[in-house]
Amino acid sequence: MSFCLTELYLWSLKNNLHIGDEDVGVHQYHEKKEAALHPDYGFLEEKQQWMESRGFPWILKNKRPEKLRDNLTELEELMQSSECVLSKWKNKYVCQLLFGSGVLVSISLSGPQLEKVVIDRSLVGKLISNPISDAIFTDSFIILSFLKENKLCLIQFTKKINSPDINRQLDKLSLLDLKISYTDIPGPKGRHLVRHLAINSMQDLALCWWPVPVDDVKPWSPVSSEKDRANLVLLSNSSCKLEVLSYIRTEGDLLNACFSINQPYQICTVEHSLNSNKEPMADRFIYECVRNKIQCVSVTRVPLRSRVISCAVNTSEDKLVLGCEDSSLILYESDCKVTLLAQADLLPDLIRWHPNGTIFVVASSQGELQIFDMALSPIRAQILAEEIEPNSTIQVCKQFNVSSTLVEMHWAAPHTLLQNMDMTDIYNLLYLRFDGGPIGVLQLKLGAICRGQLGAMEIISQYIRHDEVDEAVGLLSSMNWNTMGHQCFTSMTAIVNHLLRQRLTPDREAQLEASLGTFYSPTRPLLDTIVLQYRDPISRYARRFFHHLLRYQRFEKAFLLAVDIGARDLFMDIHYLALDKGELALAKVARKKAEEIDAESINSGVEPLLPTDTLADVNEAFVDLSLIPQVEDRILGSFPSTDLGAHNSIQRNANRQLVHIENEIGIEVYAESLDKSLPWNQECFEEDFAEENPEGIGSLKVVHFGLV
C-alpha cells in the first residue's frame, strides 16, 4: 500500500498548542526550561535531542540584528490583532505576508525552518483607506485594493533591488523610495466588498473582481447602472499609472478570475450559475482583451449535483477541479472534454494544485487534508509517527490545540515562475495559515527513490512498487502524450514490464490493454511527431503482449491483436499453436490470414516480414505445448470461454481496443528491427523467463519474438 509520509512544522512559540511529546512528526519552537511547565510530558528532552540531532532548532536564537525570537513573537501578536489578507511566495525560500493595516512581514526559510523574520511598517499611515482587501507584489510596484473604497492604490519603487541575495530581498520598502497614486474603479458604492486582484505575466494588465453580493441591486432598479453593477474590471498598467480599460457584469456568481499563464491577454473565470431546471452549474468563461475591451471567447458549462464552493486550475490549464457542497470533486479535462467524479472524505473548502500538475490537495476549514492525483485517485498519507497508520486524510487539527479555522493553503512556489518552472527542483512544502495563527508548513517526505519529486513517473513507480496497477494505469491515462511524451513512454513501459512478469489473469489482461491503449487508442489525437517517435518501440511491447496472450492460450484476443499489428509471422504463430491444441478452425483462419498478408506484400512489391527458410526453422522448433504446467490450466479456467466463430459483434467491439492501428496511425512492422536484441527489453525477457521457468523442465524455449 503506497502512502505519503509528512511532517508538520508550526512557526509558533505559544505553549498552549499542546503538542504531545510523543508526536515525533509535529514540531514547534520552545522556550528555555519548558519541560518544567509540562510535567505530564516525560519525553520532551528526548524529543529535543532527536530534533537537534537532525539539525533543527528547538529553541530560537535571539541574536542581533535578526532577533528571530522577538520578531516571531511580534508576528504572532500581529496575527491576533490584524487580519492577514495576502500570503505570497516571492520564491521557494521567501514568503511575504500583508496585513490589513499595511504591515508587511517577510519570512526567510531554510528548508521548513525559520531563518529570518522582517516586519516592515513602511505603509502604515501612508494609505488613505483601510483596511486592505488584496494586493499584488512585483519587483517594481505594488497594487492594493480596499474593502471600503472603489479605489486601487499603485505604489511604485523608484529604486530597484536586482540582487539575488535573499537578505537584500528582505529590505524594507522605505529604502525603495515609494511613489503612491490612486485610481477610481467601477462597482457598487458604499459596500464592503472583498476586491480581489490579478495581474498577467507581462505585468501590463491588471484585473480587479469581486463576488456578486447577496443583496445586490436588481438590474431593473432605476438607481443602478452598468458601471455600478460591474464586478470585473480590466485595467492597464503603463505610464506609471493604472487606467480603467473595460468593465463587465458576469453572467454568474464569480468564484475565481485570473489571467491565463500561457496566454497573457486571456482572462479565465469560474462562475456558479443555475440552468433552466434550477440545477447548479459551473461555467468556465474565457475572455480576451481585444482593443482594450473584454470579449467572451468561449464558455464551458459543467453540470453539478450541488453548488460549487472551490476550484483550481493546473499549471498547463487543461484540468479544472471543482469542489462542491456535497464533498464531491469534479475534474474537467478541457482538451479531451472528459469529466471525472470522485467523493472526498471532507468538505473541499480549499483546493491547490502542485506546481508540476500531477497531484492536488483538498482541505477543509477544520484543518483536514486529502491528496489526489490527476486521475482522482486518493493518495493515502500520514504524519510521521512511531506506528505506520496511513489514512485517506491528514487530521492536522488533531495534532495540536487550535480553535481557529484553516483559511489559506499554498505550495511554496512563486506563481510567476510556474510556466518556466525547473522540474528538477523540489517543491515539497505546503504552507498552512489558520485564522489568528498559527502558521507553518506541511513537508512531504518523498525519499531518495523519488529524488524528492512529485511527478507522474515518480508516483507511478510507487504505485507499481506496491502493486497498485489500477491507480498507475489511471494516472497514465490522464497524461498527455503530446506534451509529456517521454514521461508517458517511460511510465507505460514500466507498467507493461511489471505486468508481463506475472501470470496472466483477466484483471492483468485488461490492465495491459488499457496501458497500450493510451497510445493506440488515445482520448486525444496524437501529434505526428509523437507517433513517429514512439510507434516502433511500443509496437515491440504490443508483440510481447501478443505472445503473453498466446502463452496462456488466449487465442481470440491474440488473433485480434495480430490483426491490429498486421504481421504475417504472428498469424503463423497462432496457426501452429492452434494445430497443436486441436483448434483446427482457428488454425485454418490464421493460416488464411497469413496468406492474405503474403499476397498483399507480393502485389505491393514488399518482401515478406520473414524469409521462408526462417519460418520453416521456426516451425520445426515448436514443441508439444501439453508440457505447460497444470497450474496454468487452472488459471486459464478463470477466463471467460470464447468461441471465435460464434463471437457476437458487441463483445468483439468491447474487446478490441487496439483496432486498425496500422490504418489509423501508419504503424509499419519491420522484421529486421524486431529480430535485433533490444537493450531495454533484453534484461526484462531474461528475467521473465528465468522467473517462470526456474528449473528449465517441462517448458518451452524462446524461439521466435519472445514466444514461450
From Swiss-Prot:
Protein localization: Cell membrane; Cytoplasm, Cytoskeleton, Cilium axoneme; Cytoplasm, Cytoskeleton, Cilium basal body
A Gene Ontology biological process term: establishment of protein localization
InterPro entries per UniProt: Frtz (IPR024511), WD40_repeat_dom_sf (IPR036322)
WD repeats: 303-342, 343-382
Source domain of life: Eukaryota
Keywords: Cell membrane, Cell projection, Cilium, Cilium biogenesis/degradation, Cytoplasm, Cytoskeleton, Membrane, Repeat, WD repeat
GO cellular component: a single term: axoneme
Family, per entry: Belongs to the WD repeat fritz family.
Function: Probable effector of the planar cell polarity signaling pathway which regulates the septin cytoskeleton in both ciliogenesis and collective cell movements including covergent extension during gastrulation. Controls cell shape but not polarization during convergent extension. Proposed to function as core component of the CPLANE (ciliogenesis and planar polarity effectors) complex involved in the recruitment of peripheral IFT-A proteins to basal bodies.
Quaternary structure note: Interacts with sept2-a. Interacts with intu and fuz; fuz, intu and wdpcp probably form the core CPLANE (ciliogenesis and planar polarity effectors) complex.
Protein name: WD repeat-containing and planar cell polarity effector protein fritz homolog
Native source organism of the sequence: Xenopus laevis
